[in-house]
């Protein structure tokens, strides 16, 4: 074949590719054009900048609550994106036909680059094998064995904060302390490794990397959607070189953060592998005494059949995945709880009295701690009203029909009881919309009211359940790809609150707090700061003396 024809052939191929893209775009737009939603802000980026903007919380709430259980926003070049909070539709997407509705290419590419081939970045048979190996170590039975580890960490946190407020109430960045606490809890309970002595100010290398990850990713949010098209470009060394010399500093920052996380995970894995090879005595001398998740996981993997065993690369990736998933989400939720308790001092005092009456500060058995009603209500209500993660998506691998539990009225007045969804359409999972719909939760659904969990939930919730794995909520998602560690997170929050509220009071400062949109929502002082923090006025609680 003559090389003279190559430019012509490339031009034809490019034209065909553009034509196919435009045809697909027209097809999806014509099918979904009748779904209600806000107008595009831009012909090029649609509503993406509004949705993913750092201050996009109001826009997300508007889409979640003002356009019905199914809405439409616009992506690149006007391509429609569905927002789905309808219970029947969610059941179809996440459970009944989960093999049809896959995570987006952007999600898989991003999580692979961040954490490696772990649970978040895999699908199909590889994901099934990983999940099968992981399920036992996240069971309630195993959580019970980890409770002493949790209390041990929290007593160190208690002593450290006590030193800082012994002379009177002080302003303390509780997001930082919750981040250090969550990292140490997953370190000891998950990896059998101590990251932080929790005495000195400051944090360690891994903690700093995690703290800066979400703000850094947020600043390249729209750019991240292009990753599926470039992340396999050339060999790995070439991609790393491109990132190193990329003109945007945030991209280089993200690379350095990922490098730090991967290096730390590899070092921890290597030390655990040596201890396991030496035998039980060496393992018992490690933090967690061999009861941590990774020690049990590595032992189980070594004894698994060849068909079920996973390679070391995937085990290391699980460590990075655990550390990320169990640190930012839980620490930011705990910071949100403390802020809400500062806003609602009566609830704070009632919760404190419940905890003190149960003697939950020093140690409490798993089932007893889990049964404290107001503590449970505070955790559930915060997870309902303020889900930390709201930007999860699926994409159908074929044209499909999405059934609805209630009809949607189209922009032309047509009543739709099902929706034809073209292959490749991005579907945003309506976590916030599902958790807060007035039709399910009542007129006060937007309000933070922990006491709603102290009595039976309304029939509109119990008789029309969503498929979420946790408490009629979508916060931890549903189906085979639901959050595997939600019980770990719930127990962590309850132990933290039991110890902190037994010893300290929390009040607001005069600094304005802004919660920002990112992969995991995070707080800053004001809307312009890039530093994730939540300052609260912390004082010692004076326990009543017994007469």
Curated annotation (Swiss-Prot):
It is found in: Membrane. It holds the Pfam family p450. The keyword Glycoprotein applies. Pathway: Secondary metabolite biosynthesis. Coiled coil: none annotated. Heme binds at residue 483. One of its GO terms (molecular function) is oxidoreductase activity, acting on paired donors, with incorporation or reduction of molecular oxygen. Its cofactor is heme. This is Cytochrome P450 monooxygenase 81. It comes from Postia placenta (strain ATCC 44394 / Madison 698-R). The gene is CYP081.
